[in-house]
Amino acid sequence: MNKTYLAPTKNYSTWYIIDAKNKNLGRLSSKIAKLLRGKNSISFTPYVNNKIYIILINSRSINVTGKKFVQKTYKRHSGYPGGLKVQKFNEILNQRPNRILEKSIKGMLPKGILGRQLFRQLKIYPDNIHPHESQQPKIITFI
């Protein structure tokens, strides 16, 4: 009887830093979601957390194509009658610049316990300043 091969778990974490300045929202989000998931690893296993941490800087200067900067809307509902809140992309970018990337990347991760663990490994900052220098992150540049 053959046994299923299980990839060995990592005991160390890998830190990456990504600059979001002038990058397209969707393209960057999908690449980050793939990295968090560990799909770039040769030992990818769907149910294993690969302990990859990503620091995303300059989220304030994310780019979108077309008229999405003024036309794209984000909706949330309180659950009460008349509780629908609608905000435009540029309003959210001015108030909470991290929220746009958080919402985009979280939607691309698995729904469940693993997805919540992976999302906690994403650190987003609106400017260049971040408190993770001691982790010595590797710089990743996307074209």
UniProtKB/Swiss-Prot annotation:
Biological processes annotated in GO: negative regulation of translation; translation
PROSITE patterns listed in its UniProt record: RIBOSOMAL_L13 (PS00783)
Keywords: Chloroplast, Plastid, Ribonucleoprotein, Ribosomal protein
GO molecular function, one term: structural constituent of ribosome
Domain of life of the native organism: Eukaryota
Record InterPro entries: Ribosomal_uL13, Ribosomal_uL13_bac-type, Ribosomal_uL13_CS, Ribosomal_uL13_sf
A GO cellular-component term linked to this record: ribonucleoprotein complex
Subcellular localization: Plastid, Chloroplast
Pfam families to which the protein is assigned, alphabetical: Ribosomal_L13
Assembly information from the UniProt record: Part of the 50S ribosomal subunit.
Family: Belongs to the universal ribosomal protein uL13 family.
Matching HAMAP family: Ribosomal_uL13
Record's protein name: Large ribosomal subunit protein uL13c
Annotated source species: Gracilaria tenuistipitata var. liui (Red alga)
